[in-house]
């Protein structure tokens, strides 16, 4: 009853906000039961994209998704809206009663707080059975994340694009210092030894052996650790496993002269020998510096978890509870995940959940920036499994994992245990505040 009452109160707030001002973020309350989706033609499918961010360009969406749907479903008209400010955020659509049929969004960051908390989620398990869709053909790590959104293993969506990571390396720096290039399947210990050899100061140039975004490293850690307790409303970082993860990265930072800057300067400054970044940087680094002599290999892994990629950084497709076209929506999603269409998306540099040999071979074929690059590195090993599902009803909070390193380790020289404990305590307080605010809203709603 509390949740139902909260829906009405949040919807009213959303309407008043929409009428009165521009809203700063895509946060909103659940859909009101008396605010049904606006009627639309039976052959129109409303797709709302938040991630991938490049779907803000309609021509990219049309090329990768729109044309695919038109080819398979010629009688279907696609209405596409991409998250934007103002007027195109979750709360705006909810307030207007224009609920999408399919939402494509970042699973780790947004599904709990925007889709589930807004009561837009829908268990598609029956549709999977009805259309005999084989989920086992998809990347197991990505499907595990789909199932782990619910402690009962309900499936609210299917993966679309995994924005995965690789290790970039500057061949010229390796050649300059006579060091052999890295190879697929190397461990952090091996990469650390390379980083020490490649970190040097020559005149006014500081060559950095290794760089890494600490937030990405922590959030998508390869040991499948969760920063949140799976059973209680609190953070959970004071463990030997988390210390192991932190100690592993901080040793790179503590190599003299190898203090991390940002991986984004890999191409522009060209003084970083190795850097972990998302695969799409193959294109962006090339465009930033067409003379950059670089290639990629698989991300380093822990010696006791060899050949393990990062946890899923996946953007997934979700059918909304409010959609009146769930069957059509699912058939469209299934068509997108067919090998034929996965190959076409892979050619455009989309890391798709289907990892058959034809898909791997097709990756990046339509992108001249990827020609000659070791794109097989993207598929080396297996995706790390995501953490298990949390208990029902727990507050979701995006623990600022990057703060363990910046500023606590990088600027304040905290030891690993202290840095982890400080972020754990700060996050637990924020979770308590968020929980109290929710309880206040529940009380207000119950009085209506």
Question: Regions from the language model: what does each represent?
Answer:
Residues 71, 95, 287-353:
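Extracytoplasmic/periplasmic substrate-recognition and gating elements
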Residues 39, 283, 319-394, 418:
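Mature extracytoplasmic/periplasmic domains
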Residues 232-261:
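Glycine-centered hinge/linker elements that transmit conformational signals in sensory
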Residues 150-160, 165, 175, 189-235, ...:
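Extracytoplasmic/periplasmic solute-binding protein
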């Amino acid at each position: 009853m509390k949740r139902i009452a909260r829906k009405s109160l949040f919807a009213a707030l959303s309407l008043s906000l929409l009428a009165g001002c521009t809203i700063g973020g895509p946060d909103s309350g659940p859909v009101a039961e008396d605010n049904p989706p606006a009627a639309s033609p039976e052959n129109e499918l409303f797709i709302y994209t938040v991630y991938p961010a490049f779907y803000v360009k309609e021509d990219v969406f049309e090329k990768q998704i729109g044309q695919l749907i038109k080819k398979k479903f010629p009688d279907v008209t696609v209405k596409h809206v991409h998250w934007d400010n103002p007027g195109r955020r979750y709360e705006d659509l909810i307030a207007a009663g224009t609920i999408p049929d399919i939402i494509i969004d970042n699973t780790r960051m947004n599904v709990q707080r925007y889709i589930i908390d807004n009561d837009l989620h829908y268990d598609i398990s029956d549709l999977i059975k009805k259309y005999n869709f084989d989920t086992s053909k998809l990347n197991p790590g990505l499907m595990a994340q789909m199932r782990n959104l619910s402690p009962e293993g309900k499936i609210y969506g299917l993966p679309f694009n995994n924005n995965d990571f690789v290790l970039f390396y500057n061949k010229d720096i390796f050649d300059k210092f006579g060091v052999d290039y890295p190879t697929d399947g190397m461990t952090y210990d091996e990469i650390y030894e390379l980083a020490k050899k490649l970190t040097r100061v020559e005149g006014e140039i500081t060559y950095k052996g290794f760089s890494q975004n600490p937030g990405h490293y922590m959030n998508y850690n390869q040991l499948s650790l969760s920063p949140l307790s799976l059973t209680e409303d609190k953070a959970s970082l004071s463990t030997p496993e988390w210390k192991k993860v932190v100690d592993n990265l901080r040793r790179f930072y503590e190599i003299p002269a190898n203090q991390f800057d940002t991986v984004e300067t890999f191409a522009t400054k060209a003084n970083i020998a190795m850097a972990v970044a998302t695969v799409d940087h193959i294109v962006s680094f090339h465009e930033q510096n067409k003379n950059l002599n670089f290639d990629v290999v698989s991300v380093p892994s822990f010696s006791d978890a060899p050949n393990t990629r990062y946890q899923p950084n996946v953007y997934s497709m979700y059918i909304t509870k409010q959609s009146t076209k769930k069957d059509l929506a699912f058939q469209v999603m299934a068509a997108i995940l067919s090998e034929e269409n996965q190959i076409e998306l892979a050619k455009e540099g989309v890391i798709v959940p289907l990892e058959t040999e034809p898909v791997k071979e097709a990756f990046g074929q339509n992108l001249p920036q990827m020609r000659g690059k070791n794109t097989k590195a993207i598929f080396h090993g297996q995706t790390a499994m995501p953490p298990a599902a949390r208990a029902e009803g727990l507050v979701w909070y995006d623990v600022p994992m990057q703060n363990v390193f910046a500023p606590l380790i990088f600027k304040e020289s905290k030891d690993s245990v202290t840095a982890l404990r400080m972020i754990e305590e700060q996050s637990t307080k924020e979770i308590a505040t968020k929980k109290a605010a929710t309880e206040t809203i529940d009380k207000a709603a119950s009085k209506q």
